[in-house]
């Protein structure tokens, strides 16, 4: 009875924290983006400490109150996207699954949640969130063109600039499925690390991830990467409207992300084994987000590491 009361009290506190986090994500612009990303944390902690039943209760209470305070739509999307991830991660942590297995289940849960969000938007609300987003992008381009005209830019320069943005938005729309696949494990990883730190402070213990510099991406990733590269090159020249072009671009996106990760690991391995300053690797990682050419170089670095095994950590038959 005492244990049940304790679980009920803790679930109530965690539900209140989830509600406060939802308010921050809604009304605090910069901090809100990060808080929104880790919104599953209270659900994860409750599930890990008290089980799936109490984490579901926490999610339901938080969702109902958020619907009353903010709006049913916001509550609906929070529960659909982040709630499911929180339930899965919480149950996996309660069972003390190995970190890599936990990440696999968390990533699958994140993908299901993102897809579920889009499907439910169609069915329940009758809206297409992706088309809505890109429609707003198109409208912003009209305003941007007017702004350029008011500031004396020539029509040729305006057209070149707007066409560049249109091409960027077109590619964003094509790679949206691949972006979901990439975003899901990142979301699961961030929430797992945060939950692990909190639960460790509360006296729990979890198996550690392998050393970062010893992580490796499966070698078979090279095959879909090179095949998608050939397919993208071919369909780019022949039929960019083909679904095969879109599929190839998404496969290339996911594989490129995996190879970039492999390249980053190799950079940190080199810095650590050669006793170089760690900020070298930090700057190299930062350059990925600033210089497109550098990110492509890191893709090739990751690919070469898979082929030649510079760290000598793979089993060779």
Where do the model's predicted regions map?
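Short helix-perturbing small/polar motifs within transmembrane alpha-helices
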Residues: 9-11, 15, 79-125
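Hydrophobic, aromatic-enriched interface-forming segments
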Residues: 151-209
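Small-residue-rich helix-loop
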Residues: 202-258, 262-263
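Long, positively charged, glycine-interspersed low-complexity recognition regions
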Residues: 1-4, 12, 241-317
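Hydrophobic transmembrane alpha-helices
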Residues: 1-61, 275-283
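Alpha-helical membrane segments and adjacent membrane-interface helices in multi-pass membrane proteins
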Residues: 32-91, 301, 305
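Membrane-interface interhelical loops and short interface/amphipathic helices
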Residues: 120-172
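Central hydrophobic cores of alpha-helical transmembrane segments
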Residues: 57-65, 103-110, 278-288, 301-303
């Amino acid at each position: 009875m005492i244990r049940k009361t304790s679980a009920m009290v803790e679930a109530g506190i965690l539900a209140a924290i989830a509600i406060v986090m939802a308010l921050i994500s809604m009304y605090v612009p910069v901090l809100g983006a990060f808080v929104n990303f880790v919104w599953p944390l209270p659900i994860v902690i409750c599930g890990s400490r008290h089980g799936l039943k109490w984490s579901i209760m926490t999610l339901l209470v938080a969702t109902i109150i958020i619907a009353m305070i903010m709006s049913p739509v916001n509550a609906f999307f929070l529960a659909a996207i982040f709630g499911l991830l929180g339930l899965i991660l919480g149950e996996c942590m309660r069972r003390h699954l190995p970190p890599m297995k936990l990440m696999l289940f968390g990533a699958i849960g994140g993908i299901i949640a993102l897809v579920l969000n889009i499907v439910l938007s169609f069915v329940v609300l009758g809206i297409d969130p992706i088309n809505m987003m890109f429609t707003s992008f198109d409208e912003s381009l009209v305003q941007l063109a007017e702004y350029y005209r008011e500031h004396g830019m020539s029509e040729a320069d305006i057209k070149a600039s707007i066409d560049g943005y249109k091409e960027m938005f077109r590619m964003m729309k094509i790679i949206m499925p691949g972006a979901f696949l990439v975003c899901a494990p990142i979301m699961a990883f961030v929430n797992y690390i945060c939950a692990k730190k909190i639960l460790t402070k509360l006296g729990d213990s979890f198996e550690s991830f392998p050393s970062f510099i010893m992580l490796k991406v499966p070698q078979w990733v090279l095959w879909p990467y090179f095949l998608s590269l050939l397919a993208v090159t071919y369909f780019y020249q022949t039929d960019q409207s083909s679904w095969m072009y879109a599929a190839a671009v998404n496969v290339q996106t996911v594989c490129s992300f995996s190879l970039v990760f492999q390249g980053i690991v190799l950079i940190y391995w080199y810095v650590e084994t050669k006793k170089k300053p760690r900020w070298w690797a930090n700057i190299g990682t930062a350059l990925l987000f600033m210089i497109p050419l550098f990110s492509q170089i890191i893709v090739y670095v990751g690919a070469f590491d898979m082929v030649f095994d510079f760290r000598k950590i793979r089993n060779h038959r």
